[in-house]
């Protein structure tokens, strides 16, 4: 009888829990809670056995992988090994967050992503003939928007060197008369004697020099114009020499200022005259002139 009492005490020691949806423990069609838990465990084991077993792996860009890199020194190698194992188990499956083709298996065929012409991969993938063509001095290919005349620069215009503009002579101009030395000396001697010749004198003088009257007349006209230019230049030189280097009010006086009245003015007299309100200031001037006079003038004393 003692064993029976022990057997009846075992079920009483099991803790009975309510089901998750509020059903009573004893309302399961006559099944006990222990049999229900055993059945669920068996079904879960069958489902897990049907699925392929995949080792838990960390994604290379997940938070756990990044945190593991800082915590453990060898975590990076384990993460890479786990990612390779996941790729081998999943076949063509790619890790989330990774760029296509970056971490794929080398023997797994994958469609390459089209690369731009200016990216590093595009430059490395370009064939040699394309590189040679780009470096060739031929005209480069332009995109349609560059071919638009609004955006394309204007064609460079070659500027021709400016032509030397020469003075155009008259078509019916007579050639210049080549005078000899004897003729030039005779013409100069005659010009010093008389600048204007009469018709008879010109005819006689031209016949003596074996020249025409027109040649003698033109030579005298040119010689008179030259003499006039020389005379004007000489007068300009004389004017420049007569002008003082500095203003005359500072260094010289061309006429005496202040007569006897200015000399006899008292020392305490006002500088402004009393004749009117608009009278200019009259400074007393000494009777002796300044010693620095104009150029060409000698020193003098006022008496």
Curated annotation (Swiss-Prot):
An individual GO BP term: roof of mouth development
Protein's UniProt name: Homeobox protein MSX-1
Subunit structure: Interacts with CREBBP/CBP, TBP and SP1; interaction with these transcription activators may inhibit autoinactivation. Interacts (via C-terminus) with PIAS1 (via N-terminus); the interaction is required for the localization of both proteins to the nuclear periphery and specific binding of MSX1 to the core enhancer region in target gene promoters. Interacts with H1-5.
Localization terms from the record: Nucleus
Keyword match Membrane: no
Keywords: Developmental protein, DNA-binding, Homeobox, Isopeptide bond, Nucleus, Repressor, Transcription, Transcription regulation, Ubl conjugation
UniProt organism field: Bos taurus (Bovine)
Gene: MSX1
InterPro entries tied to this protein: HD, HD_metazoa, Homeobox_CS, Homeodomain-like_sf, Msh_Homeobox_Regulators
UniProt main location, coarse: nucleus
GO MF term (any one): RNA polymerase II transcription regulatory region sequence-specific DNA binding
SMART domains xrefs: HOX
Protein purpose: Acts as a transcriptional repressor. Capable of transcription autoinactivation. Binds to the consensus sequence 5'-C/GTAAT-3' in downstream activin regulatory elements (DARE) in the gene promoter, thereby repressing the transcription of CGA/alpha-GSU and GNRHR. Represses transcription of myoblast differentiation factors. Binds to core enhancer regions in target gene promoters of myoblast differentiation factors with binding specificity facilitated by interaction with PIAS1.
Highest taxon of the lineage: Eukaryota
Posttranslational mods: Sumoylated by PIAS1, desumoylated by SENP1. Sumoylation of Lys-15 and Lys-133 not required for interaction with H1-5, transcriptional repression, inhibition of myoblast differentiation, or binding to gene promoters.
GO cellular component, one term: nuclear periphery
DNA-binding region boundaries: 172-231
Composition-biased stretches (Low complexity): 32-47, 81-93
Cross-referenced PANTHER family: HOMEOBOX PROTEIN MSX (PTHR24338), HOMEOBOX PROTEIN MSX-1 (PTHR24338:SF8)
The UniProt record lists the keyword Ubl conjugation: yes
Family: Belongs to the Msh homeobox family.
Disordered: annotated segments: 1-55, 74-113, 135-161
One protein family per Pfam: Homeodomain
Cross-link (Glycyl lysine isopeptide (Lys-Gly) (interchain with G-Cter in SUMO)): 15, 133
């Amino acid at each position: 009888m003692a064993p029976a009492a022990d057997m009846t005490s075992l079920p009483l020691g099991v803790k009975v829990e309510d089901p998750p949806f509020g059903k009573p423990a004893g309302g399961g069609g006559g099944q006990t809670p222990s049999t229900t838990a055993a059945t669920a465990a068996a079904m879960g084991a069958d489902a897990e056995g049907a699925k392929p077993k995949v080792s838990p792996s960390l994604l290379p860009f997940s938070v756990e992988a990044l945190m593991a890199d800082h915590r453990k020194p060898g975590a990076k190698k384990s993460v890479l090994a786990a990612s390779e194992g996941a790729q081998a188990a999943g076949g063509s499956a790619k890790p989330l967050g990774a760029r296509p083709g970056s971490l794929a298996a080398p023997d797994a065929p994958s469609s390459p992503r089209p690369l731009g012409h200016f990216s590093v991969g595009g430059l490395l993938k370009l064939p040699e003939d394309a590189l040679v063509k780009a470096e060739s001095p031929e005209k480069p290919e332009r995109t349609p928007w560059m071919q638009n005349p609004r955006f394309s620069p204007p064609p460079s215009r070659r500027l021709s060197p400016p032509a030397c503009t020469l003075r155009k002579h008259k078509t019916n101009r007579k050639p210049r008369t080549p005078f000899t030395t004897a003729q030039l000396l005779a013409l100069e001697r005659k010009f010093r004697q008389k600048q204007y010749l009469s018709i008879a004198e010109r005819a006689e003088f031209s016949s003596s020099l074996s020249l025409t009257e027109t040649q003698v007349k033109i030579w005298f006209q040119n010689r008179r114009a030259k003499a006039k230019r020389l005379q004007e230049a000489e007068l300009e030189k004389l004017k420049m020499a007569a002008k003082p280097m500095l203003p005359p009010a500072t260094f010289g006086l061309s006429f005496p200022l202040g007569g006897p009245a200015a000399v006899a003015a008292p020392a305490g007299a006002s500088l402004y005259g009393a004749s009117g309100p608009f009278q200019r200031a009259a400074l007393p001037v000494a009777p002796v002139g300044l010693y620095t006079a104009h150029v060409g003038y000698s020193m003098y004393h006022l008496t």
